[in-house]
């Protein structure tokens, strides 16, 4: 039996979280076209007769000197050194540039085994030729490259085979039925944040976080009270929407997803609260992403 820890890294919006969810068969990590939706190191667990793979989904790799981005990048670096295998996800639509160079340099210096997953091969307009030239120049062997579509489930089984080929014999670190080690509070909080980001498109990606105030299991249903925290007064109105339609829509979609995951009905009450300039508070940022 084989087992091991595998980190998933890449630029923002390359499909890292979609790949994690696709392999594990559950919604574990937020998926969105908005860059850097993932903030924490999210663990997804896949177990079959061959063994167990523990995936660590990381924030999108982005070169920036802002406190928030520096904190996110620290999560990426720590994930790399904790794992036996790295999956480097490249979006087939993206022209390779400075960040690809930096990511590959970090991977190669780490001396950790890796796979390059070229994602979104179902899309017609691509930079495949440029990507393959870039990888060839970096002396990446072809047997380390796999072309996939995480969303369309193309070559995902082949991907699993390739991962197991690169893992050593080892024990099951988690019970077979586990597909994540996230605490329920964090999962619910992340679902609400993900739905909010989806509804708002790219208006407030860095300016919100969510917190669970009350989570109670009351006989036949869960009672949940949660807060969506914003950094500026004007942002409250964007989330609440005209006549409260925005917050209502966020609540309805979040409730459906939470009920499905918890396998029980839930009452979800959402509030939008202002914590001025929270995204400039280094201590709070550290707590949120660790």
Swiss-Prot record:
GO molecular function: ATP hydrolysis activity; GTP binding; GTPase activity; ribosomal small subunit binding; small ribosomal subunit rRNA binding
Organism in which the protein naturally occurs: Borrelia recurrentis (strain A1)
Entry-linked InterPro entries: AAA+_ATPase, G_ERA_dom, GTP-bd, GTPase_Era-like, KH_dom-like_a/b, KH_dom_type_2, KH_sf_prok-type, P-loop_NTPase
Record has Transport as a keyword: no
Assembly and binders: Monomer.
Main location: cytoplasm
Lineage: Bacteria, Pseudomonadati, Spirochaetota, Spirochaetia, Spirochaetales
CDD domains noted in UniProt: Era (cd04163)
Superkingdom, taxonomy of origin: Bacteria
Coiled coil: none
Annotated positions binding GTP: 10-17, 57-61, 119-122
Pfam families associated with the record: KH_2, MMR_HSR1
Protein name: GTPase Era
Membrane topology value: Peripheral membrane protein
PROSITE patterns the UniProt entry points to: G_ERA, KH_TYPE_2
Annotated keywords: Cell inner membrane, Cell membrane, Cytoplasm, GTP-binding, Membrane, Nucleotide-binding, Ribosome biogenesis, RNA-binding, rRNA-binding
């Amino acid at each position: 039996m084989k087992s091991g820890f595998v980190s998933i890294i890449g630029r923002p919006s390359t499909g890292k979280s979609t790949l994690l969810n696709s392999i594990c068969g559950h919604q574990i990590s937020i998926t969105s076209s908005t860059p850097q939706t993932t903030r924490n190191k999210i663990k997804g667990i896949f177990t079959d007769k061959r063994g167990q793979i523990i995936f660590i989904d990381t924030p999108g790799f982005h070169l920036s000197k802002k406190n928030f981005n520096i904190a996110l990048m620290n999560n990426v670096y720590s994930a790399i050194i904790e794992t036996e295998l790295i999956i480097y996800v490249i979006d087939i639509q993206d022209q390779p540039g400075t960040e690809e160079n930096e990511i590959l340099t970090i991977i190669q210096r780490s001396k950790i085994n890796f796979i390059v997953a070229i994602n979104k091969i179902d899309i017609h307009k691509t930079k495949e030729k440029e990507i393959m030239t870039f990888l060839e120049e970096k002396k990446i062997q072809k047997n380390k490259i796999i072309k996939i579509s995480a969303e369309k489930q193309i070559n995902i089984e082949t991907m699993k085979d390739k991962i197991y080929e690169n893992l050593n014999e080892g024990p099951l670190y988690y019970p077979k039925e586990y597909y994540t080690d996230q605490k329920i509070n964090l999962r619910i909080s992340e679902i609400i944040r993900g739905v909010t980001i989806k509804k708002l498109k790219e208006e407030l990606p860095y300016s919100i976080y969510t917190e669970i105030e009350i989570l109670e299991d009351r006989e036949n249903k869960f009672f949940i009270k949660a807060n969506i925290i914003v950094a500026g007064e004007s942002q409250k109105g964007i989330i609440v929407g005209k006549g409260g339609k925005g917050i209502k829509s966020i609540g309805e979609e979040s409730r459906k997803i939470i009920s499905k995951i918890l396998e029980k009905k839930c009452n979800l009450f959402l509030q939008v609260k202002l914590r001025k300039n929270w995204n400039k508070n280094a201590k709070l940022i550290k707590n949120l992403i660790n």
